[in-house]
């Protein structure tokens, strides 16, 4: 296999590997012994899911999350510089997209090291695909403010971008606060604004539905403790 930093997508939940990841990914994974991961425990679990016979103890893991210092991140690429292929694994979905993995990819690019993204599920892309919204211009904002007044202000700002820039707006919430997020959207956005709720993407019980804010009133699903993305458009 080629010497490179491989970006290795992960399933979005308990989805069987074969339904969302091509066999080529497994071939690449089995040839790597150095992994940069967001969470070691979930990475080990994913690798065992890819191949039960994989020798986890023979692998080296480097933790990359929001607490990792820039100095540590730069040092993580030493095996790659020395001639060993490396892999980047997020907790879910595609690494380096709304994910700390982007930091190590940026360093690899600066060092002129080969970077190879592999095919796999992205909740951001899949939710845009399933929403019926503008897929040529969209923005993902991560988590919105928790404080009510700030959240209301942010929602109105995102909604304004929908109408001014014709741009799809995406954001997420901690699962146990999903229902409150829906309440806030319905309270602060215009009746004609469209809201897509995309939950459990690629998993059992997948739910992707688009309606206007007016149509959602009094008819929202219970999304507590479910991974979900919210999308706004017109």
Model-derived regions: residue spans:
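A contiguous loop/helix-start segment that scaffolds small-molecule binding in enzyme catalytic cores
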Residues: 2-6, 84-85, 163-234
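Glycine/small-residue-rich loop that forms an oxyanion/phosphate-binding "nest" at active or ligand-binding sites
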Residues: 65, 73-115
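Short active-site oxyanion
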Residues: 29-35, 112-116, 168-169
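Class I SAM-dependent methyltransferase SAM-binding "motif I" and its flanking Rossmann-like core
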Residues: 6, 103-161
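Acidic beta-strand-to-loop metal/phosphate-binding motif
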Residues: 36-37, 87-93, 168-173
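Glycine-rich, flexible N-terminal cofactor/catalytic loop recognition
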Residues: 1-64
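Conserved helicase motor
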Residues: 62-69, 144-148
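Short glycine-rich anion-binding loops that position phosphate/pyrophosphate groups of nucleotides
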Residues: 12-14, 91-95, 175-176
């Amino acid at each position: 296999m080629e010497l490179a930093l491989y970006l290795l997508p992960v399933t979005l939940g308990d989805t069987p590997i074969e339904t969302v990841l091509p066999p080529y990914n497994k071939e690449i994974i089995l040839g790597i012994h150095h992994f940069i991961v967001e969470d070691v425990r979930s990475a080990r679990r994913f690798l065992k899911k890819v191949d039960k016979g994989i020798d986890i103890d023979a692998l080296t893991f480097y933790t990359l999350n929001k607490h990792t210092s820039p100095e540590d991140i730069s040092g993580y690429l030493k095996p790659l510089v020395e001639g060993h292929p490396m892999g980047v694994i997020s907790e879910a979905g595609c690494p380096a997209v709304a994910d700390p993995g982007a930091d190590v990819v940026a360093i690899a690019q600066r060092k002129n090291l080969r970077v190879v993204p592999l095919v796999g599920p992205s909740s951001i892309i899949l939710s845009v695909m399933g929403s019926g919204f503008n897929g040529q211009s969209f923005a993902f904002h991560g988590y919105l403010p928790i404080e009510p007044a700030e959240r209301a202000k942010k929602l109105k700002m995102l909604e304004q971008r929908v109408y001014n820039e014709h741009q799809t707006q995406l954001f997420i919430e901690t699962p146990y606060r999903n229902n409150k997020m829906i309440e806030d959207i319905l309270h602060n956005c215009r009746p004609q604004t469209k809201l897509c709720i995309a939950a459990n993407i690629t998993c059992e019980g997948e739910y992707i539905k688009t309606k206007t804010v007016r149509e959602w009133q009094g008819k929202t699903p219970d999304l507590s403790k479910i991974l979900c993305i919210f999308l706004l458009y017109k």
